[in-house]
Design a protein with these regions (language model features):
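Long, low-complexity, Lys/Arg-enriched
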Residues: 1-141, 162-229
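Elongated alpha-helical scaffolds
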Residues: 142-159
Length: 232
């Protein structure tokens, strides 16, 4: 069993930067954070990272952030990676991000996707997302961060993880769906858990099974889980 964070990486501002922000997760404050993934990692003690982005995403800053935490940062590696990303075209297939995966830690993976501006790119992205099913294992706990990058990625994550759970039948659990409210006027930005949206999908599925087939197993399982949470 592993705690896995699935998160997306955007391109930042025109200077390829995310501004440092203070985040609050369940009452705990994390200061001067560039990537919400860093705060989530500290708060939930994440074991592995599965990061998703395009060839233009801020991979060099991901490398800098996580390699500095491990005292393995190398200036030449950072500069070479940044140059490769800047020089790559928007339609570049993939770039070598092995140094970023190494900085993230053992078992972490990076998935490079397209911009999704046409059906071919959307299908390509879906195939990339489906690779998650090959490495997720029974018992894994999934934390989803939808703060950065394309909003469409959130839909991909919901659909694919729901498919992995219910069709491929991997015994994974969605522990949290997290969104850092950068638009908040508060100095410390709240991180909200949108897990209720994922729960609604499960309840809709259970209601459909009961309505059309008289099958109450899914609803009974969901009720049991809610009772269990209430007694924690």
């Amino acid at each position: 069993m592993a705690r896995i964070l699935v998160s997306s990486v955007g391109v930042g501002n025109e200077n390829r930067e995310y501004r440092k922000t203070n985040y609050s997760i369940e009452g705990n404050t994390y200061e001067n954070i560039k990537f919400l993934a860093s705060a989530i990692n500290e708060h939930y003690n994440i074991d592995k990272f599965f990061l998703i982005g395009t060839s233009k995403s801020m991979w060099e800053e991901v490398y800098s952030n996580f390699s500095n935490k491990k005292n393995s940062y190398d200036e030449n590696t950072y500069n070479d990676l940044k140059e490769e990303i800047i020089l790559s075209g928007e339609n570049a297939e993939t770039i070598d991000l092995s140094c970023v995966e190494e900085a993230l830690g053992k078992g972490s993976k990076i998935y490079q996707i397209k911009y999704g501006i046409n059906e071919a790119e959307l299908i390509y992205n879906l195939e990339i997302f489906m690779k998650l099913s090959e490495i997720l294992e029974d018992g894994d706990e999934i934390y989803i961060d939808i703060t950065h990058s394309f909003r469409s990625l959130s839909l991909y994550m919901f659909v694919v993880l729901n498919y992995i759970q219910n069709v491929i039948d991997k015994k994974i659990e969605i522990k949290a769906v997290l969104y850092g409210m950068l638009e908040s006027k508060d100095e410390t930005k709240p991180v909200v858990n949108l897990e209720i949206i994922y729960k609604m999908i499960e309840w809709i599925k259970g209601a459909n099974e009961f309505k059309n087939y008289g099958n109450s197993y899914t609803i009974a399982d969901l009720v049991e889980k809610e009772i269990g949470r209430a007694h924690v």
